[in-house]
């Protein structure tokens, strides 16, 4: 059963007005935290060959490095609800960013493979916890602007990932070391801590970021929890598979490597305005069903096009795929829409993302295996279409007006 109405409304009424300086700092803090959530991953991906050479990593160890993010997101994200209950969202965010800074700094200062892996895991732990907290922070501080703020931080996350991927190699070349290309980004993580310090140091009970949450919600015992996790997981599976293999598909269809890379970059570029608009649109519509169905339809149409005419219609398929991947920001805003309380939000966020990233880890692996077995793209794309159909069913279940606390 849902908690009494007084329990549901108290956290929101304690939140300061959007016009106050404290809430403005929280907004800046949310955007800066989001900016850092993929930088440590994409910068390492861009410099993986240089890191392998510098640390003498085997192919197997390099494979572990590339699979660590999804595993870490699932494993470390699970502790976020406990941390928030024991401490507070603001304090946990600061601790997460400190862990990210420590991991980013130490891993570029070591010559040990073991230390590099351990500190990379530390950085990913900070990212994993922050992943879980952002929907909660948006819900607490911007209950009437959830869609707009979710879209804004999704764009910030995407921009950080793209800029780091594009800039890591030039920075490394400019300083003559891959360590500079990885370590330079720790400055941004330090900056992300600053907006949270006034509230955390002051410890004001009136500030929602410093109030520990009480109570416990168990999404694993609810249908909406499982539907959310499956929806998030299948859309992330498609996203990771696309990022890992789309350029290769275009190269196999006859495009030059540079053009294939530009087409892949186009998925991200077109996706930025989609990410900004999708959460706000979700908040304005009376039902989520039209968005779930339209996004899945575009994704499936793109996959069919890639299977039948990857070269001739590449630009159209990229555009459809970019819009279809608007399921990611939609999933983030769904977390807030399917919880009544801050406790429910953080619990649903943790369950959704932990299980979802485990599902997502299968995407590149299964697509790569099917590609290696068949030597073509029809069967891998068939797998992605099946995932999109499952995503649709789960999304329609989430679209039903019910809550994780029910």
For the regions a language model picked out, list residue spans one by one.
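A late C-terminal transmembrane helix in Major Facilitator Superfamily
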Residues: 339-377, 383-384
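Helix-breaking motifs and short loop linkers at transmembrane-helix boundaries and internal kinks
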Residues: 56, 88, 109-114, 143, ...
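Residue-level signature of mid-helix packing/kink "hotspots" within the transmembrane helices
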Residues: 42, 70-78, 162, 268-276, ...
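Cytoplasmic helix-loop-helix junction between adjacent transmembrane helices
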Residues: 121-155
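Helix-loop-helix hairpin linking two adjacent transmembrane segments in secondary transporters
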Residues: 144-145, 152-204
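Extracytoplasmic gate region of multi-pass secondary transporters
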Residues: 44-45, 223-273
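C-terminal transmembrane helical hairpin of 12-TM major facilitator-type secondary transporters
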Residues: 288-331
